[in-house]
Each structure stands twice: as structure tokens, then as C-alpha cells.
Amino acid sequence: MDLPAHPGVLSLTTEHLLVVTSVEEEATAVLSGLTPRAADHVTVGPYAATSVRDGPSTVTVVAGGVGPPASAAAAATALALLPCSAVVNCGIGGAFPGKAPPCSIVVSDMVVAADLGAQTDDGFETLDALGFGPVTLDADTALAGACLERLVTAKLQARRGTILTVSTITGRQSRLAALASRWDPVAEAMEGYGVLLAAANFGVPAVELRTMSNVVGHRDVTTWDVTGALDALVQASRAVFASPLPQRLPWIASP
């Protein structure tokens, strides 16, 4: 079923996967896993995006910016303008100590807005504790399961777990200990909650997928492996999105 075209936006079928990254380097890695296939450079509102087609299936990749507000705005814009059937937030991230090896892949079963709340003399209170809404969002079970299954089939090192979304990256041991105790997370990044909240508001299944570039805690960028994590993101993209894409993605119900 084709939906009406929007000005400057490619008109696509309902078998349409939206991938949201934060920066262009991550978007390039995702697209590298999708080559060689026909790609169209499209405009999605104010965002430049790339759509890759495989028969009736399409993957649109957009770099929406860093942080929860930017990622939520980008995802919501794309979902308002494109007939997306599923959303994946992709990028690199940090692993909590002992939870995921360097350059391995984490697929979310839950995302948490971990620093959204109030810091008081008695400690940190989450937004839901203050009565202003949930700070946790579950990933779509079928979508997360399909992603993990494809990664494992491709013999990539991957696991599922809780991914924290933060506005300020954790670089102190005291905060690391507090977050680990509160949420038992596997990884930390800056966009997942924003993307999944936008998807939830549109009723579209979503999941976060991260490749590990560093260990959360003391901030020493000399120990990070950004290149390795981006290479792992290429492999993850190839496994999840381009195996090749079937005529109907396994997590998408018929319209």
C-alpha cells in the first residue's frame, strides 16, 4: 500500500524501516552495511537522509543529532512524514564494566532516561518518582528478538539488556556506581529514549542497537575504540538490515 507523497520526500511502501543515528559517521557505517544497493538521497523535513531499497522493502537512515531532544525530534519528524513500520536507533555506546566486551553489540530490551529527574539533598529522584511520567520504555519484543537472532546467525558477539539514555555521559566512578545499582544496565548512550518515545507516540515498534566503543566510568578517550565500534556497526547493519531484506520483514504485521 503506497501512501501519499509529501513535498521533497520519497513516497514509499509500508515495508519501511527507519534507522536513526546521532552523527553522520554512524549513519555512514549503517549505510556501508547496506551496499551495494540503490540509494536515494531524500529530504525528511529539515533532515538529509538516505533511503536504500530492496524490492518492496526500504531502509531510511537519518542522522538526527546528539542527545535525547535531538533524537526525539528527528524520529518524530520522520515518523510524521514517512510510512515507517519499525524504528531502530543505531550507534556506538559505552559498556558498563563486565557487561559487554569492546566492539560487541547490545540490543535493548529496555531503555531508561537515567538522568531525567531531580537531584536533591537526599539523592536522585527519577521523573516517574516525581509523578511526571515514566523514565523506562520497553523495546518491541519481536523486533529486538529478530535483531538479536540475525546478529547471532551472522556469528557476531551480541546480547540483549538495558541501555541507559543520558544527557551527560558518565565519567565519574560515583555516578557509575549509582547508575549500575539503580538500573543494572548493560550500556549507556544518549539517544535511545528519545527515539523510542517518539516511536511509542506513533504506535510504531522500536529498539535500540549499540556497538561498544568504550567502558563507562573514568573518561579516558585514549582507551576508546571508536573505529572498531563503527566497523562493528557496519557488520551489525549488514546482518540485521541486509541479509538481504525479505519481502516482508519478520516483525512487521500486514497492514
Please place each PLM-identified region on the residue numbering.
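Metabolite-binding pocket within alpha/beta catalytic cores that recognizes anionic/polar moieties
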Residues: 2-138, 145
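Glycine-rich beta-alpha junction loops
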Residues: 23, 94, 111-112, 165-168, ...
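Hydrophobic/aromatic beta-strand patches that form the interior of the parallel beta-sheet core
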Residues: 62, 88, 106, 159-164, ...
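Short acidic/polar active-site loop segments enriched in Thr and Asp
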Residues: 85, 186, 205
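Active-site rim beta-loop-alpha module in soluble metabolic enzymes
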Residues: 123-187, 194, 198, 202
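Glycine-rich phosphate/pyrophosphate-binding loops
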Residues: 202-216
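His/Asp/Glu-rich mid-to-C-terminal helical/loop segments that flank catalytic regions of hydrolases
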Residues: 216-255
